[in-house]
Amino acid sequence: LFTLSVRNGSKRRMVVSLGSSSNFILKTKPWAHQLKALEYLYPRDAAALYTKPGSGKTKIMIDLIVNRGFKRVLVVAPKKPCEVWKPQIQLHSDIPPENVHELYALSGKKKAELLKTFKPVQPGEGCSIFICNYDSVWQKPVDKVWFYKKLGIDCVICDESHRIKSPSSKCSCFLARLGKIVPHRYLLTGTPLAENPMDVYAQYRFLDRSIYGTNYRAFCEQYQNVDINLSARVGFPILDKKQPYKNLDDLKEKMFSCAFYMKSTVKLPKTTRMVIKVPMPPEVEDVYKELAKEGALEMEEGFLTVNNALSMVIRKQQVTSGYLPLERDDGTTELKRISTYRRTFLYKFLKQLPESEPVVIFAKFQKDLYSIRKVAERLGCGYSEVSGRENTLKNWKSGKTRILGVQYTAGSESID
């Protein structure tokens, strides 16, 4: 392996030669596993990239776009990961910022209007990249525009592709149709089998339908182990409890026939894991035990009832957070605060840390994030948040704030 730095006008690039493989033009130096992944993906028109979060999948795909010479690229991702792509493209390539279109930030009408302005690719034309989220890529009026010949989409990248694992979802079906006409297709995810082996079907229906076919029932018959007797009694398929799946070696062999998987070569600092138990005060513990025992609570401000096991889990979590959603007789709901013990503990814990130490705190409920914000204000340090209501991550990354509160659902994927 050797690298040679060359100049292209005022810009500096690297030409990387991998033995007998093609020379890759790279703007930024790749890690070893990124080079191997690029070498694997480069000759393939349909392939999957399975590496862990933080391993640089986005850079690999940007380098692939540049070196394959794609002209019209559609990147589909969840909305939060969509925000990562444009800064990464500017960092790892010389593609002009004006050629990167963040469609996820536009209405459906404006998406369609923008795409309709594109004419067929001309000789010498640069690359245009369209970044769109899964929730809107298939919706009208933009859905038909992706198929226009004059738009000429020649590559589709599904980032966090486990989002299309449901064979019946409208987004998954739409991308399967689009995959039939687009010559180059790629999957990116760290969890291709997020819940069970059946998750692979819809992803590969988009990627390469020749691998598992397009008949989901036949796919299930081949890889699911159904309890025939129990299924006959209830009238619908029930999987065998002891061995719900079969032929998994065959499934994995086909799955990795066009997929690259490799552990990251990046050596991160060792982490220290500590479990700190925060005892509940007696008044909170009493409420928790009564709720667990009776499945209901009655207070002066209102009452609370639990109808199922999932609801019970959520209500218990709310109690430990120090809040209770109580319903009044008139049907209105009040979120009653029963304790601030966790806020007090968090303040004492953060007080022990160096003032320059950046902190990330994950939480589930909006009231938890509110408590974290109040602790930050009490400490006199800045606060940023990644949630369904707010995204001020840039302030934390730039050092303007010290504490970052992250809601689990909003910060679960591709936060750079």
Task: Indicate residue ranges for each PLM-predicted region.
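Conserved helix/coil segment N-terminal to the catalytic DExD/H
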Residues: K110-E125, I129, D135-G152
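Inter-lobe coupling linker of SF2 helicases/translocases
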Residues: I131-S136, V145-K150, S169-P183, Y212-S356
